[in-house]
Amino acid sequence: MLEKLFGFDASKHKVKTEVMAGITTFLTMAYMLAVNPNIFSSLASKGMDTNAVFTSTALAAIVGTLLMAFYAKKPFGLAPAMGLNAFFVFTVCLTMGYSWQFALTAILIEGFLFVLLTVTKVRTLIVDAIPATLKRAIGAGIGLFIAFIGLKNAGIIVENSATYVTIGDMTHGSALLGVIGIVLTSVLVIRRVPGSLLIGILGTALIGIPMNITSFNGIVDTPPSIAPIFCQFEFHNILTIDMVIVVFSFLFIDMFDTMGTLVGVCTKAGMMRPDGRIPGLNKAFMADAVATMAGACLGSSTTTTYVESAAGVAQGGRTGLTAFSTAVCFVVALFFAPLFLSIPAAATTPVLVIVGLFMLSPVKDIDLNNYAEAIPAFITIVMMPLTYSISDGILCGMISYVAINALCGNWRKLNVTICVLAVLFVMKYIFI
């Protein structure tokens, strides 16, 4: 039955490993249950219920992750996208002046367009057009990106007006807890302790109690109603230029963030074939697209596949059972919100850093002596953490790949799809 439901093969997979991987993925994603409502609190004065946002965030994660589990049978968690939620609140609503109902309508339309692109296999066509070298670079770039996120969340890396970033004060507070957690989790991983990443998160959170970083604000609570934001759409502005721009922006960022995440994590999980293709990728895209539409109905910003899924993959998750376990955790989180929200961001830092290391492994398969391949790969890798964007890393990498190989006369390496995409990406940077 497990094989039919989740693609589980008893000769290759273990139930315990898949479940532990799912829990690990959840714990690395759980921060958004606190962050997302906090970001949307800026719209409270415009009538968007912040408490309802918490419930919609969890429900969107549940629906999206279950779709990934049962339909795509992949070990990935989905939830409202961090970054796109800020675009929703601060750009569409607060800067452009549109209502949150307008923004939800844009997300619904974006999700519908995603479904069309997936049904016509346009998204799969784009992925297949990306050279294997860049796919490996995408995985490595995401590794650096999530490690950077982890270090930033703990305050180990902080802002600096002169150098943009610098090292934080690691003698106390979250930064110290993050450092302790990295050492603790590293030892567990090196000693091959089963469930080392999950134990690392929980152990770091417990250490944070006497440091006054981890604080428990209760255990059980009734989930707030989503009625105030459920299916709140505004269709009378859908033909405006602003709606087109907003929909395109959501679509563009979500498409390449999701594509980068799926390609990177699938590569790390050993799901990529020697020819660079990933079996079942179109189903994963469809799950992501439908989840975005469902999320809009629930009152959530764009729902997407989370890069933190790499934590579960690193823990051994390979099937839909991992995603199902993650979804179950989100169901539990609805009723144990105060408890789950007690896990500080610094407690997830060790996992994000170590998983970042794990995801660097595809670099060894990049031919660093072939500069026509190595330079675009390096640009892809380094631009993700430096621009704080997976999609920008992919775009810069693909533009440089086409430009370098075209000017060097390596036309046989290039296909029509990647050349067209490179031109579109250049136009995007010029005009948008």
Where do the protein language model's features map onto the residues?
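Hydrophobic, aromatic-rich alpha-helical transmembrane segments
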Residues: 11-22, 46, 50, 54, ...
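Active-site cofactor/substrate anionic-group-binding motifs, chiefly glycine-
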Residues: 49-95
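Membrane-embedded alpha-helical modules
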Residues: 96-210, 214, 324-432
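Residue-level signature of catalytic and energy-coupling elements of molecular machines
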Residues: 19, 39, 126, 195, ...
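Transmembrane alpha-helix interface/packing and boundary motifs in multi-pass membrane proteins
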Residues: 64-77, 186-192, 250-257, 288-298, ...
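Helix-loop-helix hairpins and the membrane-proximal interhelical loops
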Residues: 1-52, 166-167, 199-282, 423-427
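Helix-coil boundary and interhelical linker segments in multi-pass alpha-helical membrane proteins
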Residues: 38-52, 91-102, 241-244, 342-344, ...
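Helix-loop-helix junctions within the multi-pass membrane cores of secondary transporters/permeases
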Residues: 2-36, 60-61, 81-90, 94-142, ...
